[in-house]
């Protein structure tokens, strides 16, 4: 009988997982710290494999603590740090570089290059975002240039949600949702995925991108016989939780930084 729900919170400083029963009681909680590296001032990177292993460890810990069985889990919800960028080889499953974290400024020179090309107004019109190192597209470009990669045929890109689902499905599913895609500089908000102008500017092929999926979708996990229930990023999920539905209301998250 499917009687449990798991929530995964993959954040900047830690990975957490919570097991709930049908009455929304918390049966078990697990958390593991995530390490950040700082190769240069303003640069922030993480080991994408460590992120995955910490998630797997947290899930295993829930079952050990609660006595629940994987086949009793009805669904898994995922919330994650956005913008953080992973590029990996789809044949080996290995990242080609550390994940570049959302707050990293290491793509500043690339951003300035594109601003000088005069593409920022059009990109803002198409994506709703300004050109800034914060967002994922320039992080992808930085990784490819750092590794001197011209052919991206065997490569995949994902934010952390995409990376975790891809790992959970043994490479069978490469997807993301609107809440994550909207922070990549690659989502055309007028007709959704993808922003061709920036793909061309960054010399990226659309084959590297995950499929933009509806928020309600079912996946059969290879490691757990359950479905991945709608994942959403922390900020937007908190707005729903606190009934922030009008322009007069707002919600602020203050960990690990302040998000409005």
Give the predicted meaning of each segment:
Residues 1-97, 109, 125, 151-154, ...:
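N-terminal glycine/serine-rich phosphate-binding loop of ATP-dependent small-molecule kinases
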Residues 10-12, 123-232:
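Gly/Ser/Thr-rich active-site cleft segment
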Residues 23, 81-82, 105, 162-163, ...:
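Short glycine-enriched loops at secondary-structure junctions
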Residues 61-65, 142-150, 236-238:
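Short alpha-helical segments and helix-capping/turn motifs at coil-helix boundaries
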Residues 85-114, 154, 158-191, 220-260:
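Glycine-rich phosphate-binding loop of actin/hexokinase-like ATP-binding domains
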Residues 118:
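Structured, active/binding-site neighborhoods that engage oxygen-rich ligands
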């Amino acid at each position: 009988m499917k009687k449990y729900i798991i929530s995964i919170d993959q954040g900047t400083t830690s990975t957490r997982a919570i097991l709930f029963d049908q009455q929304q009681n918390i049966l078990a909680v697990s958390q593991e710290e995530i390490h950040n590296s700082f190769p240069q001032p303003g640069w922030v990177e993480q080991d994408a494999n460590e992120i995955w292993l910490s998630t797997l460890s947290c899930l295993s810990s829930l079952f050990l603590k609660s006595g629940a069985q994987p086949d009793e889990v009805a669904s898994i919800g995922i919330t994650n740090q956005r913008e953080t960028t992973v590029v990996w080889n789809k044949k080996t499953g290995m990242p080609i570089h550390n994940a570049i974290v959302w707050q990293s400024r290491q793509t500043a020179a690339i951003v300035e290059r594109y601003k000088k090309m005069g593409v920022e107004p059009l990109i803002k019109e198409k994506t709703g975002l300004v050109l800034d190192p914060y967002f994922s597209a320039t992080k992808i470009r930085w990784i490819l240039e750092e590794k001197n990669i011209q052919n991206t045929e065997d490569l995949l890109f994902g934010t952390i949600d995409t990376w975790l689902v891809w790992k959970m499905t043994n490479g069978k599913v490469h997807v993301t949702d609107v809440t994550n895609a909207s922070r990549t500089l690659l989502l055309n908000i007028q007709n959704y995925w993808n922003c061709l102008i920036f793909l061309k500017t960054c010399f990226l092929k659309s084959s590297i991108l995950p499929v933009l999926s509806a928020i309600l979708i079912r996946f059969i996990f290879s490691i757990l016989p359950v479905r991945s229930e709608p994942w959403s990023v922390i900020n937007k999920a908190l707005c729903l939780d606190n009934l922030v539905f009008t322009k007069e209301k707002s919600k602020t998250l203050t960990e690990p930084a302040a998000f409005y």
